[in-house]
Amino acid sequence: MRVVQVANFYGPRSGGLRTAVDRLGAEYCASGHEVFLIVPGARTERHLLRTGVVRITLPAKHIPYTGGYRAVMPGAVRTVLETLRPDALEVSDRLTLRSLGRWGREHGVTTVMISHERLDRFAGQLLPRRAAQKFADFANARTAANYDTVVCTTGFAREEFDRIGATNTVTVPLGVDLKTFHPRRRCARVRQHWATPTQILLVHCGRLSVEKHADRSIDALAALCDAGVDARLVIAGEGPLRARLERKATGLPIDFTGFISDRHAVAGLLASADVALAPGPHETFGLAALESLACGTPAVVSRTSALTEIITADSGACADNRPEAIAHAVRTIVSRPERHRRRCARRRAEIFTWQRAAASMLATLGAMAVSTRCGDTQDTA
């Protein structure tokens, strides 16, 4: 099967979306399928990736106030699709590229839209709640009508489609790289670099943008300090809010690393921490938190996000969107025996593999056969 993936908001620092698209494409290739990926960039380029995916970059303009993201328009993508003649089309953009579903239908191509975010929650950051929901319902109804299937990564992500009565949704949880993100990445030197032996080391890993709410991690650290807890926070990531967050963190034991391109270095930081913080209230999956679990580090997550479907009572904690609640959850986690909490975190992450996610996606895309590797085999090395 020839699969074409299309993704806007895909770049060197685009985090979870890029990870998901790349890993799914790699697994499709490993299952014997031909995969092309169309993304925006500064110029036209074509590269054969080590995974076997052919990545085609189309020139696109920067989107203001997004920290460097670009978006390619549907017309340019349709021109490439005409030459590629795919069997299946997988789109990861519900706004600028939604019209590609109609192109697929007109050309007899199986079409899938992956819902990487809650559109009603996203719009709710700019519009009153009722207006945001009305906008999301209209856009989501068009998406559901234009695509054969809408893939949601969690029940939380699916809620806004359930609300409009869409009947062509499926739920496919994403995965985690269990080799890269592993408890063996824990490193005494890394921990010593960031914290003293007696400190509680917290880490917030993610893009420094409004929806991630890194400010809540800062406030939670302040609440811990006010309560007499010796804790330190490392914020790993880059984004448009960095300067504002650094000002907010003044005087607190908080370090900013900026963007870390080396995934092994990210894994080393996560594995060396005591607790990871993922306070974003709108997360539809939360790959960074899952990567933390894979490293054996429990996570505190927002009670209003999809991460409540990922985190279990023994692999972390769900907290209300208040600094005091997050701080209390941290103290509860670190009160448990370290060996037990780390083992439970890792065990929970092992359920989520890219092989399993890709098997479900290929079934949705209409593959007639799925390789054994993309089936029940779990990579728990």
From Swiss-Prot:
Transmembrane regions listed in the UniProt entry: none
Gene3D superfamilies: Glycogen Phosphorylase B (3.40.50.2000)
Keyword Ligase annotated: no
Pfam family, one: Glycos_transf_1
EC number: 2.4.1.-
Binding site for substrate: 16, 207, 211-212, 283-287, 291
GO biological process, one term: glycerophospholipid biosynthetic process
Key word Cytoplasm present: no
SUPFAM superfamilies (alphabetical): UDP-Glycosyltransferase/glycogen phosphorylase
Gene Ontology molecular-function annotations: glycolipid 1,6-alpha-mannosyltransferase activity; heteroglycan alpha-mannosyltransferase activity; phosphatidylinositol alpha-mannosyltransferase activity
GO cellular component, one term: membrane
Signal peptide range in chain numbering: none
Alphabetic keyword roster: Glycosyltransferase, Lipid biosynthesis, Lipid metabolism, Phospholipid biosynthesis, Phospholipid metabolism, Transferase, Virulence
Site (Important for catalytic activity): 283
Pathway: Phospholipid metabolism; phosphatidylinositol metabolism
UniProt similarity note: Belongs to the glycosyltransferase group 1 family.
Role summary: Catalyzes the addition of a mannose residue from GDP-D-mannose to the position 6 of the alpha-1,6-linked mannose residue of the triacyl phosphatidylinositol dimannoside (Ac3PIM2) to generate triacyl phosphatidylinositol trimannoside (Ac3PIM3).
Protein name as catalogued: GDP-mannose-dependent alpha-(1-6)-phosphatidylinositol dimannoside mannosyltransferase
Organism: Mycobacterium tuberculosis (strain CDC 1551 / Oshkosh)
Gene: pimC
